[in-house]
Structures are given as C-alpha cells and as structure tokens.
Amino acid sequence: VRGRDDACPGALRLHPADDGSLARMRVPGGLLTGRQAVALGRVAEELGDGRLDITSRGNLQVRGLDAGCGAELAARLRAAGLLPSDRHDRVRNIVASPLSGLDGGGHADVVAWVRELDAALCDGTPAGGGELSGLSGRFLFALDDGRGDVAALGADVTLIATPDGGAVLRVGGPLPGPDVPSPPTAGTRPDAAGRRGSRTAGSAAGSGLRVRSEDAPRAAALAAVEFLAKARESGTRAWRIRELPARHAVTTEGLVARLADAGVEAVPVEREPAPRARATPPVPGPVPGPNGRHALSIALPLGRVSAAQWRLLAGLASRSGADELRMTPWRGVVLPGFAPDDTRGALAELSDAGLVTTPDSAWLGVGACTGRPGCAKSLADVRADTARMVADPARGVAGTAPGTSGTARGAADPAGVVADPAGVVADPEAVVAGGSMPWPVSGTAYGGGPAGPDPLPVYVSGCERRCGHPGGRWVDALATGDTDYRVTVRGARGDTPEADSTDSVDVTAEQLADAVAAARGTT
C-alpha cells in the first residue's frame, strides 16, 4: 500500500534539485510542430539553464529553473498548445512508433491514435476521460504501429496495429511481438467473448482484446478508467497496472464489459506462443519513405541538447515541409519530410553541431545519470567523466554499434546527459528497462538487423541508486568517490543490479575508458 501520491515532476509541478527547479513537459507521442519546438527552446534559454533533455518516454525536461517561474512557464506552454489541460498535465504519457507513416513499415500510421488518445485523456466530461486526471504521472500508454518497437517498453496500456486494419489492446507488462494472433471472426458476439475471457488467466495483460482501429484510442482510455476503478477497490493507491494485487487485477471479462458499456466491441485474442518484441531505436541517418520523402533520424548524446542544437533541429523541422519534430523513447529525434537531395546537407549540419547522424557513433550504447552538480546524492560529475571516456581515441571505449566500422562521429559536444530528477528513485523516465535507452538489443544490429555479439550497454552512475540504468546485461560504472569508479558487468540473467554480477574492478576516472572497454566485450 502506497502512503503517498507519486512525485513525478510536470509542467505545473516543479521538482527542486541542486541546480534549480526541474520541469517535465509531456509531449504525447513525442510530436511537436516547428513552432512548438521553437517555444520550448526559448523556455530553456530564457527560464532554464539553456539545455533540454529528452526522457525515456519522449518527453522534455528543462533544468535550472527559478522556483518562482511556474506561472510564466505555464503561460508560455499554454500559448504554444503544449498544456491543453492543467488537471491532466502529468497523465499525458504516450509513446508511439516514431517512424510510423514515414518508412512504409508497420501496419498503420498511429499519429491519429496519439491525437485521439490525448484528447480522450484530457476530456473532463463524465462521458469522456474525466476520471483520468487521477492517473499517476508514471502510468504509460504505448501506441505501436505493428513493428514492435514500442510494444516492448512495458507500458500499462498498449495498442498494436494489426495487418487487417484493426488493433489489439493489451493491458500490463512487457508485451509479445507484433505478430499478434488472428482474432475471432467479426461475427463473434461480445457475450461469447466475455465467456471465453473468463476461462483465461483472468488478466487482460495475458491475451489482449481485438478492437476496431477507430475505437482503439477510446478503448485505451477506458482501460485506464478500469485500472483506476480497480486501484480504488484495492485501497493500495497503485500507480501502475503491475502494482495491482491479483484479486484486484484488470480482467479480460471486466474490461470487455466496460468497453461494451461504452459501445466499443472487444473480442479476446487467444494466447498463442509469440516472440517477445524487441525495442529498437531508429537507426541514425536518412530514412527513405514510400512517398519519395525522407526522414532524418538523429540520436542525442546522453539525451541532452544545447539551445543552439535545439534551434537547429527546430529550424530543420520547419524547412522540411512537414513542420514536425518527433522525439523518441530512445532519447532521439526524427525529422520527417525531406526531399532526398536535401538529406545530405541537413545531416552534415546536424553532425557538425555534435549530434549523432550515423550508426557508428561512439555515443550509441552509452548512458549516464544526472550526477553532480544537479543531484546531491551523486559522488562525481558523471557527465563530464562519461564525455571524456567516450572521447578517448586510444581506447574506443564505447565500441561501436553492432556491424559498423567503429568511427566515432557525433561525439564533439555531448551537451550533458538526460536529466533525472534528484531524489526520485523510481522515476519511470529515469529507470529504464528492456533497452529503452539508445542502445542496441542483444543479438541484433542497431535498428534490429541480425548481427554477431553486441557490445554491452554502458551506464555511468553517481551513486548506488543507479537512476536510469538499463535492463538486461550491462556494464555498470559506479562512482565511489570524486574521481574513482567501480566497473562491473551486471544482469547476466536478470534485471536487477545484484543479478549475476562479474567481479568488480576499481579504477580512477582516467582509467575508466580502459576498464569499460574491457568489460563491454564480455559475453
């Protein structure tokens, strides 16, 4: 039983940190117009420390804010269309397939789903999502276009587009892959579906529900309403689906009934063996599209950009013709709408500015927590130490993305690291599971192609909380003092820092590159 509400920062709830207050702006699906991007850049420059951080949910953070700037910040966000509902500010947590509709992959363009779900979340009427203002700031929706990229990010409610133009609604945990089983025939009645659901394990997370594409966003919102009802029943003040006790789980039968009451037909999908989806980021570089236009995929060193870098991204978004910037849950950016002849010049501008535009960058696979001076608990300035580690040309510590040559491009200006609020141990946008930082998944090339053994992801932490560390197997570089680190390979067969660790090596910051390079090659 939780004794308090979650403390996730928002645009209206600033979080105090050692380097000033922190604001987190929810950006559903990571979708921004060029005008909105410019407005956010001005917020960072004029109110914050001049930098922006992309979180593991494709949201934005600004640090270094004055504690009294909340009213001005909110007014600027409202004017830019980035704060449609004060009551629902922190619940608009939606990740979406960032290349949806751009590269010919997937089964549907889920951008429309993003817009409709966001509207449903902010609908304050009883017939809409009025209850949803009670969701925790940690509750997450994922909208997958069928390629399986965001379906594995452990969202509370996930929609997966299917080849026949429909959708599967899944509730809870890490999800099976995009090859979802075929639903029952369209003639199956909801009452029969409910009876079949009652014979399952009783959790909608176990099988999923087939819904029409046009009903999918509303079905996702109603699944969240069902969660809130179960959370109240349980008296546990649960923040996430997985925290509900078994006797108060969101069941297939209960969810089918709630959807039916709202006029949404939902048919349970039979559980069948399916490979787990792998959450893989778009490959940095040009992304050809079937309409003759190209998108640009850019990774950000440690998830942070300077105001100048952000202005460049916003300017290119406006010049492209699409006037759109998409932030990814891997702390990258996708810019749609470029003519093929314009991509080379745009990528050169981005690379010259210190951003990652090729899949062979030494920054790929490297993450770090906030560290000093932003976090009082950190023992070291891990951002600076990580930048020196990556830039060490003699060691090539970061290795390369699998299947690439090893050239370290885009490492000129790390611009800092992703901002995780100091003191928030279980922040969902800091604690990263299942590879949702910009690193390859074991056994695949960057972007999902087959490859040989991959270099392990590296995470540099300022204290033993290890805020933001990846799941799976990873290299843990833990600060033990101002200039000292302990390097360990962790998580060989588990997701906790204590699982199956190798022997540790204690080194100075100057020796970190060698130690991490050796550990990263461990298989």
Identify the residue ranges that each predicted region occupies:
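Actinobacteria-biased recognition of intrinsically disordered, low-complexity terminal regions
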Residues: 1-12, 180-200, 400-450, 518-523
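Small-residue-enriched alpha-helical segments and adjacent helix-cap loops
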Residues: 20-170, 175, 179, 201, ...
